[in-house]
């Protein structure tokens, strides 16, 4: 499922990666088509569900195929290990082409049937304290961030001296997505 502008490139990717049965459908075409045209496929747990790309930090970005089993195992394990419930509120501000954003804070939240909030990354990059304000306003309990966001918040030290945030709703904050700097 993709934007119509990317269809040709994604079809080439499927062919070059030898992905059998690879089908790319434009969101616009899906909206126009009668529902009976697009039958839901019968899926095997080992069928590809997502193709995500590495950052390329060690060379060219590489495509990583995640199966339905990979994704659902990760979300079920995370929920069980952390005792997450339907009462959670997740907040994501990272791009959905990152496994943490799409699987951890997207699909897991759907599995939980909990509230999820997604805001553009640029919002937090331009105004880092917006992240804290959103946590407070929506009583967020789960979020994640790479290291650099904590540095951006630290750079707001003067403003933080005059601010007050109630972040007591937070139960789980993951620091991931880049090397830990010391």
Question: What are these model-derived regions, one by one?
Answer:
Residues 51-53, 63-65, 90-92, 117-118, ...:
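Structured core elements
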Residues 4-25, 121-182:
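Conserved adenylate-forming
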Residues 24-25, 32-53, 60, 83-89:
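Conserved pre-ATP/AMP-binding loop-to-beta segment of ANL
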Residues 46-47, 86-88, 114, 171, ...:
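Surface-exposed loop/turn positions
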